[in-house]
């Protein structure tokens, strides 16, 4: 079973609804709860569909794959997405939180975590026609 958890802190200077909007820009299929201190969401691998498409369009699958594999632990992995960029409908995948306002933490669990990583961010370092 696949499980996706997302959490984004809400700082005192931020509007919780805007933080929720940032999360939904990247994960439109996610069920979220907007609270004063954080936006939290849960879903399954289907909630990653939009992210998968964006990674392909922006040609950052290999970067994302490297981060996902670096943080691989048993049947889970995690990464961050820049919250400010997400509000502007952009995806910047991060190894660690770098923004003073905090970034969106994404945690993924799966019985087949490598299969999920291969789907979300396939290894595109070798073109398919060369690999054969």
Curated annotation (Swiss-Prot):
Source organism superkingdom: Archaea
Pfam families noted in UniProt: RNA_binding (PF01877)
SUPFAM superfamilies, sorted: RL5-like (SSF55282)
InterPro entries: PAB1135-like (IPR002739), Ribosomal_uL5_dom_sf (IPR022803)
Protein family per UniProt: Belongs to the UPF0201 family.
HAMAP family: UPF0201
The protein's name in its UniProt record: UPF0201 protein MTH_433
Organism: Methanothermobacter thermautotrophicus (strain ATCC 29096 / DSM 1053 / JCM 10044 / NBRC 100330 / Delta H)
């Amino acid at each position: 079973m696949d499980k996706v958890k997302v959490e984004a802190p809400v700082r005192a200077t931020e509007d919780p609804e805007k933080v929720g909007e940032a999360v939904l820009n990247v994960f439109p299929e996610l069920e979220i709860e907007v609270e004063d201190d954080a936006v939290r969401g849960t879903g399954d691998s289907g909630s990653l569909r939009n992210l998968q498409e964006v990674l392909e369009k922006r040609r950052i699958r290999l970067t994302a794959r490297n981060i996902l594999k670096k943080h691989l632990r048993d049947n889970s992995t995690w990464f961050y997405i820049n919250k400010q960029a997400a509000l502007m409908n952009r995806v910047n995948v991060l190894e660690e939180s770098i923004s003073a306002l905090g970034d969106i933490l994404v945690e993924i669990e799966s019985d087949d975590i490598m299969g999920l990583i291969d789907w979300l961010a396939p290894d595109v370092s070798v073109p398919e026609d060369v690999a054969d």
